[in-house]
């Protein structure tokens, strides 16, 4: 009996002396399900978790909610309201990355950039240094779905990856319409192969979509309001200057400067090929219903097209609707021989005034 008591006491001492499991090992042992309430905690420990819940996180000023090291196959869920401290810096405020990642949100959640603190009407062209919102970079076979994002300081999503799906995303920067919001692009896509954006609902002050380079890109079922329209370009003077196999379809552009557009940089080299705009409805477009021009320089048109970025195998099919009284339904400004193999049908845009400045319109198209 005395021996048994001593044995039990010894066992108890050993148990007491054993080190407590680390926070990381606890997460792994519990099936890798983690709820975080701070950005630092999430960024440091996300790689240990298969299911990540971000609950009412207030990201400190000048810091990134960095989820780029999430483990393969992880699911990231935003709950409540995610906010960010104020600082003049380049950002991003959030970073995603990884393989087979799913990013989603709980019902009623919102990611609020509180952009009015930075808005000054200048965007990225001066004034306050403004952080970009969300980098979705180095994503492979991943999905971002159902997010509600509002009040971005400047550009919202920067997308670089392969086989990336962005589904049913709401971007509401409408507060910036009368408060100095500028350069609030919804989706900037570059250096990607396979990006599929479906069901986006966007209110902003710049491009709803801007494709700067990449291939096999689809943008379908979108509603774009208040910005600059659905764009390819400007193409040229980047590390990658090729855009091919793009489909934009079944979408509506409302109260925007432009409906659909392709713009290439004057004097640059590159290519745009295999682009289809199909079944696009335009409403109250302020400047150009359809605009395709090869004359951009220093952020604006020059009126003098160049031929270094040819636009070939373009299909414009079923683009209909209206432009404002002072707008132009269609504007085409191509270099000599640098726009070819176009298919143009079912284009019917009412209102505005026909342009007399179109140049080198390819066979089959009309201006």
Swiss-Prot record:
Residues 1-17 form the signal peptide. SMART domains: PbH1 (SM00710). Its main location: secreted. Gene3D superfamilies: Single-stranded right-handed beta-helix, Pectin lyase-like. Glycans are attached at residue 279. Optimum temperature is 55 degrees Celsius. It catalyses: (1,4-alpha-D-galacturonosyl)n+m + H2O = (1,4-alpha-D-galacturonosyl)n + (1,4-alpha-D-galacturonosyl)m. The active site is at residues 206, 228. Pfam families: Glyco_hydro_28. Disulfide bonds join 34-49, 208-224, 334-339, 358-367. GO terms for molecular function: galacturan 1,4-alpha-galacturonidase activity; polygalacturonase activity. GO terms for biological process: cell wall organization; pectin catabolic process. It comes from the Eukaryota. Keywords: Cell wall biogenesis/degradation, Disulfide bond, Glycoprotein, Glycosidase, Hydrolase, Repeat, Secreted, Signal, Zymogen. The keyword Repeat applies. PbH1 repeats lie at residues 161-191, 192-213, 214-234, 243-264, 272-294. Optimum pH is 5.0: Stable between pH 3.0 and 7.0. The keyword Zinc does not apply. Its EC number is 3.2.1.15. GO terms for cellular component: extracellular region. Residues 18-30 form a propeptide. Involved in maceration and soft-rotting of plant tissue. Hydrolyzes the 1,4-alpha glycosidic bonds of de-esterified pectate in the smooth region of the plant cell wall. Belongs to the glycosyl hydrolase 28 family. This is Endopolygalacturonase I. It comes from Aspergillus oryzae (strain ATCC 42149 / RIB 40).
